[in-house]
């Protein structure tokens, strides 16, 4: 897991973000992007019980809404009424 996948990560631009707990800058990928001991999985479609059959690009199916539809694993789901953490 990476900082980018943490609930405490605040995206700033295409290269870096901010940890809401430590207030420190963290890179999206590469050196220093590994998750810390305070890691909590972010509410993303890929972390939901209703997300299934992702392909190699992270495109899968959401089965939690009235009508099944495609969804990206990295899509934010904090406001989704059907989100259920795995």
From Swiss-Prot:
This is 4-hydroxyphenylacetate decarboxylase small subunit. [4Fe-4S] cluster 2 binds at residues 45, 48, 62, 80. [4Fe-4S] cluster 1 binds at residues 3, 6, 19, 36. It is an enzyme of class 4 (lyase). The keyword Cytoplasm does not apply. Keywords: 4Fe-4S, Iron, Iron-sulfur, Lyase, Metal-binding. Component of the HPA decarboxylase that decarboxylates phenylacetates with a hydroxyl group in the p-position. Active toward 4-hydroxyphenylacetate and 3,4-dihydroxyphenylacetate, forming 4-methylphenol and 4-methylcatechol, respectively. Is likely involved in the catabolism of aromatic amino acids such as tyrosine fermentation. 4-methylphenol (p-cresol) formation provides metabolic toxicity, which allows an active suppression of other microbes and may provide growth advantages for the producers in highly competitive environments. It catalyses: 4-hydroxyphenylacetate + H(+) = 4-methylphenol + CO2; 3,4-dihydroxyphenylacetate + H(+) = 4-methylcatechol + CO2. Its cofactor is [4Fe-4S] cluster. Its EC number is 4.1.1.83. Disulfide bonds: none annotated. GO terms for molecular function: 4 iron, 4 sulfur cluster binding; 4-hydroxyphenylacetate decarboxylase activity; metal ion binding. Binds 2 [4Fe-4S] clusters per subunit. It comes from the Bacteria. Belongs to the HPA decarboxylase small subunit family. It comes from Clostridium scatologenes. The keyword Lyase applies. Heterooctamer consisting of 4 large (HpdB) subunits and 4 small (HpdC) subunits, arranged as a tetramer of heterodimers. InterPro entries: 4HPAD_g_N, HPA_decarboxylase_ss_sf, HpdC_C.
């Amino acid at each position: 897991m990476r900082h980018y996948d943490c609930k405490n990560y605040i995206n700033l631009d295409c290269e870096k973000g901010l940890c809401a707990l430590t207030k420190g800058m963290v890179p999206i990928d590469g050196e220093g992007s590994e998750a810390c001991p305070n890691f909590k999985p972010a509410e993303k479609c890929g972390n939901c019980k209703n997300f299934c059959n992702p392909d190699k690009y992270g495109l899968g199916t959401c089965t939690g809404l009235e009508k099944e539809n495609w969804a990206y694993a990295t899509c934010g789901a904090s406001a989704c009424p059907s989100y259920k953490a795995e």
